[in-house]
Curated annotation (Swiss-Prot):
Gene Ontology MF annotations: ATP binding; magnesium ion binding; phenylalanine-tRNA ligase activity; tRNA binding
Keywords assigned: Aminoacyl-tRNA synthetase, ATP-binding, Cytoplasm, Ligase, Magnesium, Metal-binding, Nucleotide-binding, Protein biosynthesis
Pfam families: Phe_tRNA-synt_N, tRNA-synt_2d
Name the UniProt record assigns to this protein: Phenylalanine--tRNA ligase alpha subunit
Signal peptide: none
Single biological process term from Gene Ontology: phenylalanyl-tRNA aminoacylation
Cofactor details (free text): Binds 2 magnesium ions per tetramer.
Source superkingdom: Bacteria
Family, as annotated: Belongs to the class-II aminoacyl-tRNA synthetase family. Phe-tRNA synthetase alpha subunit type 1 subfamily.
């Protein structure tokens, strides 16, 4: 019986050395230690032994069983450690590898132009002012000297929400709001979104403007021309030709359209400038005394100028964009160029 137990232990240890999985280990445990296992079968034979042999062999059985259980437990621990090590190896992260590059967006050309224009005027001492896009008739028209029968007040040109509330058609209302809150001197620019009933290759029902205002004692038309010339030369390059043509705006007098030498043909004449050599980019003029009356400024003491430009038009000229609608279509093939 003793020899049989020793042989059984040797066989179990030999098989155990070949086991590499937890399932295999469980099969071996059942084979030798289960209810119908080989060691259990030996233990059932103890009853056939003499009273003298029974305690001796019983001691051997317990020793074999304890040793086998210990070896199985040790093998199980090693298998679990091997599994854990393999998992760690397979899931190892090489921190020296470069990270995956994510596609990076770019700023929209409209944003780029607004930022550049804002920076130029900041260098000239202008602050940025803002106002609501849903505006009252008083700020959008009345305080800016638009007569009641002015075409801009018609439904085909303006998005009216009610008889006196509308989507602002320009950012000039910001100038009125600023002057009502602030005594001179005033030096601001007002970038923002504006709305008009218009849509084609060169017009959009929603577009962007930057308007500027400077009010102080002794401000002249010469100051206006000087400021705009500096701005144009910084935006389009030194030496860019500038000319002012007489025009009319309800809120300025005198008024002027400001042209630059065509950025495409350098003033020689082409299809873009209709062979004139010039491109209109903004309107400007000296603030009308009637506007001062609405904001309680004394026009005998203070004078000033205002100007306004469409950002889309500036962007089209600066980047050579032929169709304004490209600026609003969110086509990444177009936007990635900036």
């Amino acid at each position: 019986m003793r020899e049989k137990l020793e042989a059984l232990l040797a066989d179990a240890v030999a098989e155990l050395s070949q086991v590499s999985t937890e399932d295999g280990l469980q099969e071996l445990r059942v084979k030798y230690l289960g209810k119908k296992g080989e060691l259990t079968a030996v233990m059932k034979g103890l009853g056939a032994l003499s009273p003298e042999e029974r305690p001796v062999i019983g001691q051997v059985v317990n020793t074999v069983k304890g040793e086998l259980e210990a070896k199985i437990e040790s093998a199980g621990l090693k298998i679990r450690e091997d599994i854990k090590a393999e998992k760690l190896r397979s899931e190892r992260v090489d921190v020296t590898l470069p990270g995956r590059r994510r596609p990076i967006g770019t700023r929209h050309p409209i944003t780029l132009v607004i930022e550049e224009i804002t920076a130029i005027f900041a260098g000239l001492g202008f602050l940025v002012a803002e106002g609501p896009e849903i505006e009252h008739d008083f700020y959008n028209f009345e305080a800016l000297n638009f007569p009641k029968d002015h075409p801009a007040r018609d439904m085909q040109d303006t998005f009216f929400i009610s008889d006196t509330v509308l989507l602002r058609t320009h950012t000039s209302p910001v100038q009125i709001r600023t002057m009502l809150k602030q005594a001179p001197p005033v030096r601001i620019i007002a970038p923002g979104t504006v709305y008009r009933c218009d849509s084609d290759a060169t017009h959009s029902p929603m577009f962007h403007q930057i308007e500027g205002l400077m009010v102080d004692k002794g401000v002249t038309f010469g100051d206006l021309k000087g400021i705009l010339t500096i701005f144009i030369n910084q935006l389009f390059g030194q030496g860019t030709g500038v000319r002012l043509r007489p025009s009319f705006f309800p809120f300025t007098e005198p008024s002027a359209e400001v042209d630059i030498a065509c950025v495409i043909c350098k003033g020689k004449g082409c299809r873009v400038c209709k062979n004139t050599g010039w491109l209109e980019i903004l309107g400007a003029g000296m603030v009308d005394p009637e506007v001062y009356r609405h904001v309680n400024y004394d026009s005998e003491i203070y004078s000033g100028f205002a100007f306004g430009m469409g950002i889309e038009r500036i962007a089209m000229l600066k980047y050579g964009i032929s169709d304004m609608r490209l600026l609003f279509e969110n086509d990444l093939r177009f936007l990635k160029q900036f």
